[in-house]
């Protein structure tokens, strides 16, 4: 009888943990989206689409490097904290990069060192939000629209990212202030 009670209690505890872990992950992301500071990261052109990558737009950012003094202090793939500010147009700018998590209320995000320039003068950053997943029926059209607007210098294309306490969530990809999903939807309706 006692062993059945212990098994029942253990089962309940395991079930609660299995519910708690994904619920906490969802709540943490919802908090970043609802109360995190929004940044606009200007997007740079990338290579043509890779058909093996799946249903997302691969993003590359203009603001992805920072000047460094000593390349020996940095290693490819290591976690870094990117302190951010915004320029006069409201786009994200890297203020500095640190190996230590900032303690004060500065705007920062956790990222990785992508690589260090051959001459050691720049550190390139790999952001955790370099893929924008889309509904399967719209992904291909979105990729075409995205690539077309990047070639047109009169178009302003950027990623809208919410950031709070180092965590970041890619909210949307915008073209001239309009979500890419809406542009693709409109283009698909116009073709009908």
Annotated model-derived regions:
Residues 101-192:
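Soluble extracytoplasmic domains of inner/organellar membrane proteins
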Residues 45, 55, 63, 86-88, ...:
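A mature extracytoplasmic/lumenal domain signature
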Residues 36-38, 56-58, 77-79, 154-158:
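Extracytoplasmic
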Residues 21-41:
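Aromatic-capped interface at the extracytoplasmic side
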Residues 64-119:
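Structured domain cores in non-transmembrane regions
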Residues 5-24:
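Hydrophobic membrane-insertion alpha-helices, especially the h-region
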Residues 28-32, 50, 62, 154-156, ...:
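Extracellular/lumenal and peripheral-membrane lipid-interaction modules
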Residues 40-71:
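Short extracytoplasmic
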């Amino acid at each position: 009888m006692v062993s059945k009670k212990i098994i029942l209690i253990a089962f309940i505890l395991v079930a609660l943990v299995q519910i708690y872990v994904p619920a906490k992950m969802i709540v943490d992301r919802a908090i970043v989206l609802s109360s995190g500071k929004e940044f606009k990261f200007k997007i740079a052109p990338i290579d043509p689409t890779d058909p093996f990558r799946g249903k997302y737009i691969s993003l590359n950012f203009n603001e992805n490097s920072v000047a460094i003094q000593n390349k020996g202090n940095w290693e490819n793939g290591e976690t870094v904290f990117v302190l951010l500010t915004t320029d006069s147009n409201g786009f994200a700018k890297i203020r500095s990069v640190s190996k230590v998590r900032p303690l004060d209320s500065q705007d920062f995000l956790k990222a990785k060192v992508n690589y260090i320039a051959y001459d050691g003068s720049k550190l390139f950053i790999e952001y955790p939000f370099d893929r924008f997943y889309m509904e399967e029926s719209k992904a291909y059209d979105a990729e075409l629209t995205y690539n077309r607007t990047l070639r047109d210098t009169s178009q302003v294309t950027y990623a809208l990212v919410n950031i709070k306490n180092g965590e970041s969530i890619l909210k949307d990809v915008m073209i001239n202030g309009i979500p890419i999903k809406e542009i693709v939807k409109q283009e698909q309706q116009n073709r009908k």
